[in-house]
Amino acid sequence: MKKLGLMALAAILTLGMVLGIGQVVRADIVQESVVYTIDGQPYEGYFALNQGFGNNQPLVLLVHDWNGLDSYEMRRAQMLAEQGYATFAVDLYGQGVRPRNTEESQAESGKLYADRATMRARLAAGLAEAQQMMGVDGDRVVAIGYCFGGAAVLEMARAGMDVDGFVSFHGSFETPEGQDYSQTQGRVLILHGSDDPVAPMADVAQLAAEMDAADVDFDMEIYGGVDHAFTVWTAGDRYDGLADRKSWRALLTFLGETID
């Protein structure tokens, strides 16, 4: 292996130790695939729980990126379980529907962007499934999402779903016509890069104005010079280790304040 390759590997391993992304799952973490049905069709979520924290653990509902539920969301769920948050990664596409490229990701996410009622129904069904998992306190819930999932958790907020908090990582912020945040019941945290072309700062300002108008309890952390998908380890140059670590700490603080 070339020296450059060794240096890159060392950097990745160091980052993994800081974030926990490269660690073997601890023995006390229970993890399982969970198949559930919506309108007679199967969906496959993923559940992680740390047995060391006992029963009635606060719940995190994790919504996947536009390429569907994969190893990224599973690792994030494990990381949250290690901190004492039972985590259910919801499936919005259906069992076996896992986009393999950009075109397929656009197609699957586009179906739900175009049909918000279906998006809401699948989110609500995933939430209900998560709340009845063993060891979970279904009355203490925060929903988080990445990219497409970041937009989806804001859909949950506008729908008035009974959740204590909503966290959007590098999501998109367009509010469909006829919707607003007047029914939002929980706190909102936005974690975003200032150079995100998917949701530029004008969109951030618009979102803040909409939530202000609805008297929503919200906070925003903006990471200067940071691109879209900054927490995604496989996103190449868009990945930003510092912003990833900052946003992870912000999430843990939010969870501690909201559902601990």
Region roles according to the model:
Residues A143-G145, F169, L191:
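Short beta-strand immediately N-terminal to the catalytic nucleophile in serine-hydrolase-like folds
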Residues S33-M133, F230-A235:
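Serine-hydrolase catalytic machinery in alpha/beta-hydrolase-like enzymes
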Residues G145-G149, V153:
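Gly/Ala-rich beta-loop-alpha elbow adjacent to hydrolase catalytic centers
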Residues G135-Y146:
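Alpha/beta-hydrolase fold nucleophile elbow
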Residues D212-D260:
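C-terminal catalytic histidine-bearing segment of alpha/beta-hydrolase fold enzymes
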